[in-house]
Amino acid sequence: MGLNDSLLDMQLLTIGINHHTAPVALRERVAFPLEQIKPALSTFKSVFLGHPAPNAPEAAILSTCNRTELYCATNDRAARDAAIRWMSDYHRIPADELAPHVYALPQSEAVRHAFRVASGLDSMVLGETQILGQMKNAVRTASEAGSLGTYLNQLFQRTFAVAKEVRGTTEIGAQSVSMAAAAVRLAQRIFEQVAQQRVLFIGAGEMIELCATHFAAQGPRELVVANRTAERGAKLAERFGGRAMPLADLPARMHEFDIIVSCTASTLPIIGLGAVERAVKARRHRPIFMVDLAVPRDIEPEVGKLKDVFLYTVDDLGAIVREGNASRQAAVAQAEAIIETRVQNFMQWLDARSIVPVIRHMHTQADALRRAEVERARKMLARGDDPDAVLDALSQALTNKLIHGPTSALNRANGADRDSLIDLMRGFYQHAPRSSDTSDR
């Protein structure tokens, strides 16, 4: 490894796709189930083994319904292309299919993006708070996987502090239309009275809990929760005065429900076209309103083509959510100003960190010179040389070697470069004569 390789600055980089750049059909293919994130981080780091950069990259993966993002810090200048290639290979998606939807954000752009995401400015639901918890979970997972280092740790700690500042000093989260509220609004377009409908929730996570809260407020005729873990499903149903049912009963009982909201962590659809066709037939073509908030999707997309079935995904709900975002543009401007200031602060810290390897290398080189000359002096003393002469030789050798680099650089430099070096050296050696003092007299 050469000197230049060892002194390359660490660079921040974010690679990802989100609801702005890719439809749900692609987002679900690049999503990482929680149990896959640690192994994925390990394979990502292995990509850089054998590269000229001296350090394995720091990395964290954020995977939600609306985004899959890889945050990394590396001194490998080929990291951008390598990261995109890795994501393509890992998910077995052709690079030419994935690349048009991928954003690659270096340095300050990566910092700004992280701050905006955590603050809810990049969310489908402007100002929503769920993303902050998801980002904290991503950081915790990266830490447990051993892929979080100084740079990303500092980035995320600053990110969480900025999110707290934005939410505490602006109205960014006020009057926001959540995905859950948007689902209720859509249901009201299909059914005049949600209170007369039977509602089924599939899953028992945070998103289903939010949806159940909003639908329960409408006083539905019946509220049922089906979950893979029966105990958790029963607990959630009890909270809202509903009842639980086994997930295995879903195909046989789907026809009983007018509204079905699903959001599970399943990697494959749990509601297929055939099951819904049978449910529609059993209902004698009374409409079914279905909301699929999962990524990857819980409901096969072909279901949406059935007559009397109204199927909506997270992207469909986004249109309703955006209607409520326009009224909070003043808060957005205020939040963006805060973020911009904090980005500059972080970049100052990053710039300061960039000189650490240089200083460390200077110390290492100087110490190597010192040890070599001390060893030479010891040998001179051992053979009986005069101590004063040995000390004089030691000091002369150290002086010559320590100033060899600067003087060689000055001798090689020309014109403006030489003037800049002279000014730089003057700062190093406070008693160096000014240029005018060195001219011929």
Curated annotation (Swiss-Prot):
Domain of life: Bacteria
Pathway: Porphyrin-containing compound metabolism; protoporphyrin-IX biosynthesis; 5-aminolevulinate from L-glutamyl-tRNA(Glu): step 1/2
Site (Important for activity): 113
EC number: 1.2.1.70
GO molecular function: glutamyl-tRNA reductase activity; NADP binding
Top enzyme class: oxidoreductase
Keywords: NADP, Oxidoreductase, Porphyrin biosynthesis
Keyword Oxidoreductase: yes
Catalysed conversion reaction: (S)-4-amino-5-oxopentanoate + tRNA(Glu) + NADP(+) = L-glutamyl-tRNA(Glu) + NADPH + H(+)
Binding annotation for substrate: 64-67, 123, 128-130, 134
Coiled coil: none
Active-site residues, as the UniProt record annotates them: 65
Function: Catalyzes the NADPH-dependent reduction of glutamyl-tRNA(Glu) to glutamate 1-semialdehyde (GSA).
Family: Belongs to the glutamyl-tRNA reductase family.
Assembly and interaction partners: Homodimer.
Domain remark text: Possesses an unusual extended V-shaped dimeric structure with each monomer consisting of three distinct domains arranged along a curved 'spinal' alpha-helix. The N-terminal catalytic domain specifically recognizes the glutamate moiety of the substrate. The second domain is the NADPH-binding domain, and the third C-terminal domain is responsible for dimerization.
Name of the protein: Glutamyl-tRNA reductase
Organism in which the protein naturally occurs: Burkholderia pseudomallei (strain K96243)
Gene: hemA
